[in-house]
Amino acid sequence: AMVGLVNQARPGHVLTLEDPIEVVHRDKRATVTQRELGSDTRDWSRALRAAMRQDPDVILIGELRDAETVRAALSAAETGHAVLSSMHTTDARETVLRLVEFFPSHEQPRVRAALGASLEGVVCQRLVPRADGAGRVCVVEVGVRDARFAEAVADPDKTHDLPEVLAEGSWSGMQTFDQHLLALVQAGTVDVRTATMAASNPHDFGVMLRRTGWTPAGAVADDGAR
């Protein structure tokens, strides 16, 4: 989806490294070059080194799987390339921790510093059943680079504060999973039971619900009148 958005929005060279190629992108405003692991290249790090010689503006790495790939991705980002990728993690905080934990302890401070300087954002997704039974809806957690976000990424003592940073950063487009779930419950898109099961912190999610004064659609609040 991000490659498609870039392709529609602006000219430039987008280079993708995928395993396997799942969607073939036709050139629109951008030129899209797609490479497949196993067919066009033997490994991610080798592919990234070759990619840098093709003058890309945007590089998509199908998945960050090991330290060597993350190191190459950071190097590309530090030289001014926009780098997109994916990981199998549960939320923004785990994403940062996983990126750092690919590396031995003596390298982690440098990696954190590089991430703090280069990581522009994190988008995490979960699919949860709709209240009307008509399929699923995507719940999204978003972290966007600002001073607090960068500090929480770079400082191991503050990474645990990332959920709070996201929750308080709505002005810049940030939100936690639980905040989005709350909005979906209020809109009637997801029921409370499903939302609570999907919440990152079910107890805190319940507190959020009560603080909003939320009541189920069709319910009448008991104000003591008879």
Which sequence ranges carry the predicted segments?
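Short, flexible helix-loop junctions that flank or precede catalytic/ligand sites
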Residues: 1-226
